[in-house]
Amino acid sequence: MKAMLGSVLALGLALVVSMVAFANVTEDETDGFEPDHKVVIQVSSADPKTHALALSNAVNIQKHYGIDNIAVEIVAYGPGLSMLTKQSSVTERVSSLMIEEITFTACGNTMDTIAHNTGKQPVLIKGVGKVQTGLARIIELQEQGYSYVKP
């Protein structure tokens, strides 16, 4: 009887240990999720048609691959920074696409130049990220395997 009880306890302990180990592996796998596809879209034009096209490109590629299978980041610098300011003609669309897991990044150097020239810092749409150098961000993303698109 004692031998049987010992075997049951050992089996139970082994089961608990394996369940904990499996749970940790599953958790680690989801933490490091990497989408099948990655794209960075450059916007360096002040033209509202270019802004609309960049957003359409992002939406279309996300629809094609599926929201869970692609990472999309739009990086704006130079004259293209106007796309990500509160005065942009696409402000509402940019805000709604953030909900759809599209990332927007503004160039800090461009913002500093605008502030120096106008005396006012541009006001970005809420949720837009900022890096020091937009072009460097694009290079870094390409080095991480992102495909490059310029509408």
Predicted regions and their residues:
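Bacterial N-terminal signal peptides
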Residues: 10-18
